[in-house]
Amino acid sequence: LEFQTEDGKTFMDGSAVAQAKAATITNDTGNKENIVELTLTDEGAKTFAEVTSANVGKALPIVYDDEVISYPTVQQAITGGTAQISGMANYEEAESLASQIRIGSLSLKLEEMRSEVVGAQLGEEAISSSLKAAAIGLVIVMIFMIVQYLVPGVVAAFALAIYTTLVIATLYLFEITLTLPGIAGIILSIGMAVDANVIIFARIREEIADGKSVATAIETGFARARSAILDGNITTLIAAAVLGLRGSGTVKGFASTLAIGIILSMFTCMVVTKVLMHAVYAIGVRDAKFYGKAKERKPFDFVGKTGIFIAISCAIIVCGCVGVGMHKSSDGTILNYSLEFKGGTSTAVVMDKQYSIKEIDKEIVPLVEKITGDGNVQAQAVEGTKQIIIKTRTLSLEERTKLEKTMTKNFGVDKKDITSESISSTVSNEMKTDAIVAVVIATICMLLYIWFRFKDVRFAGSAVIALSHDVIMVFICYVLAWISVGNTFIACMLTIIGYSINNTIVIFDRIRDALKKHHAQTKAAYKEIVNKSIAQTMSRSVNTSITTFVMVLVLYIMGVTSIREFALPLMVGLLAGTYSSICLASEIWYLLRTKGMKKE
């Protein structure tokens, strides 16, 4: 807050104001008038007396945050340390001005809680490589769909093109900033969008195999696939919603694009794909051979091999836990917490050559320690690149600027190749708490939805066990691969939870349909239903996993380091989720459902 003369010179700041309040008085003419009463400090009163004495009849603008908030004219010299500003239209206007003056008079010191500075070249390269990955992955998925599903595959390719266009248009319409996690959300949603088409086409093939006409098969296939599509997408949408409400800025970017992708994928598969399928049929493509026919699969005894599946999972988890223990004994910690969860400053620098760890410790670390006064500087090289990552305590803006200048001067680094991120310990603790709450809330909501939809707590119970299996697998991946654990860790976990539940729901949906038709009374009957349901959905489970995995794999190959750290555990989670949905979830439901039941 500044008090200025007409020529723009500041003669007094907000510290000279002791009090400012709105009031309504009766003036000399007997009319009520709304004013602001100013009470000045002793030093302020002295300065104000001198300036007003020399500026009678002139204006003394009051400026707050570079904006003139009042333009009062001096009627007479003010020497008593109090002043009145008149001319307000109503009391609310007077109160607003008084409030601004009070706020401006406070002695506030801003403390930087979080900052992120990205070099222009790094940002452009990251966005460019991620978008290329999305385009390549999309083309691969389209080719796979055409080869696998013939005419419906061509329809799916067109629907995917329309879907992608709608996503881009929506992002542009709502002016959603495209971040790297946001692009990851788009790429993942493209892979998951294929799932709905795969479910529909599998149902259509089954209807044709049952002897129905193509026209009837198309209509019935869409109708029978609807419940599985809605249930699977709603559970993933729940995860996206929780991420959007509880996550930080970068995670919200991932959540928003994922949510948009899910909503638009449901629209394109249930409306666009259906219209295109009917259009293809209408122009004369009516022979069943163009649509494919479901092959009769001899059900594999998945239920009978439950013990083997559980033993395999337990063996992997035990080996992983041993690796975790060895990792802790050598490094002293289990997880590689990123800045979001522990606070500090991370500076990424693209050097003019690849540096070894010894060179970094000898040439770079001592300089950073000297600048920052931090004796615990951590620096590492990004494998296969010229980039190094320097982690320190939280640095001030001045310290970051000094570090930047030093790197530019001593190593010839271009300023645009330096990226820095700072997070205070306060923010990191809040983010860690929000992350835990987000996972718990999302998981509970998804499981409650399953319970509500399937009217059987055993479905939810078996889903919990399968999800725990997937989460443990991904956790082990983070530990052994020493991947940074931050907000993308939460995004990855919730994505895997949503994906795994989606896979599991498709099989549960088949079991539910079978239970409506066949009133099973024995273990053998339930065993047959479960084995047949898994066999019927096997092609869908495998094909969906392949398309989603391909999208993430391309992202891993072409993405920058931060994206790779998201894609790698995501691929592990996709494999674990596919395995658990096929080999564990339904089998565990069978064990819970038939507990205490006679074999025959």
Per-region residue spans from a language model:
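Non-transmembrane, solvent-exposed regions of membrane trafficking/translocation machinery
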Residues: 1-74, 83, 97, 450
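Small-residue-enriched core segments of transmembrane alpha-helices in multipass membrane transport
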Residues: 153-175, 186-193, 254-269, 460-481, ...
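Juxtamembrane "pre-transmembrane" interface segments
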Residues: 80-84, 92-140, 395-443
